[in-house]
């Protein structure tokens, strides 16, 4: 009988290191079903984990029809990572002949492969899960990364409290001024 597999917590969002450790625990407990691979590196150098789920006794993953499932494409989409963990747990628990066995899951993993990438954007997720969270839509890589900075536009947390609360700070000597007919617009100071 295979070793007991881990049970993820569904009342929390995992930080990157904890998530990879959990995925490795599945691979260690069920090497006949779960293979943890590295899909690539993030902008900040974190591994992008890929979990390959299939019954290796019935063939290699390269030789079976497949389905791809991913989560956390955008920084704050943490629930998608949890959904991937839930599905991984159901697949592993449901395969075989144990108390939670499900014949449909067994047939699926005997004849198919499931590629699960629970967190495509580990850098953005880490920002969202930080002690002082920062919520961005995408990744920490600047976008567009080849664009020159705009004079007068400073995209940063000025006071270091982890929040950007004000878009405009008046500066009588700055490069920009309010438009005379539409004060909500800024125009270059001439």
What are these regions (language model features)?
Residues 1-190:
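M14 metallocarboxypeptidase catalytic domain recognition
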């Amino acid at each position: 009988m295979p070793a007991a597999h881990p049970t993820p917590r569904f009342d929390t969002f995992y930080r990157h290191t904890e998530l990879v450790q959990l995925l490795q625990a599945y691979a260690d407990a069920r090497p006949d079903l779960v293979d943890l691979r590295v899909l690539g590196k993030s902008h900040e150098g974190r591994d992008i984990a890929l979990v390959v789920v299939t019954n290796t006794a019935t063939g290699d993953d390269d030789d079976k029809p497949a389905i791809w499932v991913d989560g956390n494409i955008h920084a704050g989409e943490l629930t998608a990572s949890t959904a991937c963990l839930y599905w991984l747990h159901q697949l592993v628990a449901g395969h075989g002949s144990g108390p939670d066995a499900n014949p449909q899951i067994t047939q699926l993993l005997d004849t198919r492969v499931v590629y699960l990438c629970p967190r495509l954007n580990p850098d953005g997720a880490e920002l969202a899960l930080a002690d002082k969270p920062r919520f961005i839509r995408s990744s920490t890589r600047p976008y567009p990364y080849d664009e020159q900075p705009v004079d007068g536009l400073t995209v940063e947390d000025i006071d270091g409290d982890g929040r950007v609360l004000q878009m405009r700070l008046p500066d009588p000597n700055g490069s920009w001024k309010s438009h005379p007919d539409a004060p909500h617009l800024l125009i270059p100071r001439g």
